[in-house]
A protein has these predicted regions:
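Surface-exposed loops/turns
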Residues: 17, 27-28, 54
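A short, solvent-exposed beta-strand micro-motif common in secreted/extracellular proteins
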Residues: 27-39
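Short, acidic Ser/Thr/Gly-rich low-complexity loop/linker segments typical of extracellular
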Residues: 4-20
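Short strand-edge motifs at loop-to-beta-strand transitions and within beta-strands
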Residues: 20-23, 58-60
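Periplasmic OmpA-like peptidoglycan-binding domain that tethers envelope proteins to the cell wall
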Residues: 112-218
Length: 218
């Protein structure tokens, strides 16, 4: 609980086993309430105690989503062919990821980057590592603690899956599938390669504290 207007010191409470909680709040004020649970993303809301009486009860529910084990796709972070430079659109997406990490301030994440299948395996692995690092560097520049971020490049080893518009089946965008369009539909050929040039993130920890970082440095 954070007192937005009155300046009262922030405090925490614990729910019961069913998730219920009760706390009297100072009247004539506004409160920012953030709910958290291990292995879940946080949720928050503001509660206004102006124009109510001491007998008024306010119900404020929170919905916490479980942190998935698999990587989470970040739609919109894409790269030009053979480049690790962030596009303007990618910067906007990373700004939203930055806000997410500021709110979920205990998460430690791995930024995963992938390439298309053109180029050697070694080159693509190095390129994807540079792409992942470019995202990490940007978030660090914005103010995220470096200890909360890891960059991991996977090269062309994990092609994306799409749903075939005709068969409605899941298709892995391997080079052998994409190459069928190289002559009959050049635009689609490039589009499918672009889908493989992507970045995602995976939560690898939810216990970050500044104290733990300081202990590692001692």
């Amino acid at each position: 609980f954070k007192d937005i207007i009155g300046g009262q010191e922030s405090f925490k409470i614990t729910t019961d086993d069913k998730g219920y909680y009760f706390k009297p709040l100072k009247l004539g004020d506004e409160w920012f309430i953030r709910a958290s649970k291990s292995k879940y993303f946080k949720d928050a809301n503001a509660v206004n105690t102006k124009s109510i009486t001491e007998t008024t009860r306010i119900r404020q529910d929170f919905r916490l989503e479980k942190i998935p084990i698999k990587e989470i796709s970040i739609d919109g972070i894409e790269y030009d062919f053979n480049s690790a430079n962030l596009r303007p659109q990618s910067i906007e997406i990373l700004d939203r990821l930055y806000d997410f990490l500021v709110f979920n301030d205990v998460l430690i994440v791995e930024l995963n980057s992938h390439t298309d299948a053109r180029g050697s395996d070694t080159y693509n692995m190095n390129l994807s590592q540079r792409r992942a690092q470019s995202c990490v560097d940007y978030l660090i520049q914005k103010g995220i603690n470096p200890s909360r971020l890891q960059a991991k490049g996977y090269g062309e080893t994990l092609p994306v899956f799409i749903t075939d518009p005709i068969t409605k089946k899941e298709i892995e965008l391997k080079e052998s599938y994409i190459n069928q369009f190289i002559r009959k539909d050049k635009a689609k050929f490039e589009e499918l390669h672009q889908l493989n040039r992507r970045t995602a993130f995976k939560v690898i920890g939810d216990n970050f504290t500044r104290e733990s970082t300081n202990n590692q440095m001692d």
